[in-house]
Amino acid sequence: MMFWRIFRLELRVAFRHSAEIANPLWFFLIVITLFPLSIGPEPQLLARIAPGIIWVAALLSSLLALERLFRDDLQDGSLEQLMLLPLPLPAVVLAKVMAHWMVTGLPLLILSPLVAMLLGMDVYGWQVMALTLLLGTPTLGFLGAPGVALTVGLKRGGVLLSILVLPLTIPLLIFATAAMDAASMHLPVEGYLAILGALLAGTATLSPFATAAALRISIQ
């Protein structure tokens, strides 16, 4: 099926540019590490501010990786070829965003036990953090994809991309950190996780169509 061919192709291309995959991950880890060094290793304080630290770091590292979502395709001319495929353009966008999450969002999940240890979180707090990252990081990709499509042809589109995308991530940031706060106090988190799941479902449904329209505008 052509959808999965595009998905596998995107993964192969991403692994050929391993430095661009590693840089956001290093940025994420460096930001997480700086907080214990700057405010001290007090476990209670670190556990209290951990949700904000983790999600701001995840958001900023995702923005670093988002810029290359369509950039290479535009530079080598393959973006126009993708638009001419018999597969609908929203499906192409969905395959690209899924592959992008596999190489940028999934590694954050793998690093989550280390992050929990650095910030003095308990096992339950780590489990909830992992769930928020599982639901939230693909949502970041879907929220950012239309902005990337609009700025793909600009030489210095990184700042504009941040201005477009960051306000859209505020609800995600609120509910993800609220879930982690509730977990730290051993309160129910199901409602927050349900909202994060709804945000993921909504963005996964609507974002490919908005991104496809933005790509057509940028290419014209």
Swiss-Prot record:
The keyword Chloroplast does not apply. It is found in: Cell inner membrane. This is Heme exporter protein B. Residues 42-44, 122-127, 180-192 are periplasmic. GO terms for cellular component: plasma membrane. Belongs to the CcmB/CycW/HelB family. One of its GO terms (biological process) is cytochrome complex assembly. The keyword Mitochondrion does not apply. Keywords: Cell inner membrane, Cell membrane, Cytochrome c-type biogenesis, Membrane, Transmembrane, Transmembrane helix, Transport. Required for the export of heme to the periplasm for the biogenesis of c-type cytochromes. The chain crosses the membrane at residues 21-41, 45-65, 101-121, 128-148, 159-179, 193-213. InterPro entries: Cyt_c_biogenesis_CcmB, Cyt_c_CcmB_bac.
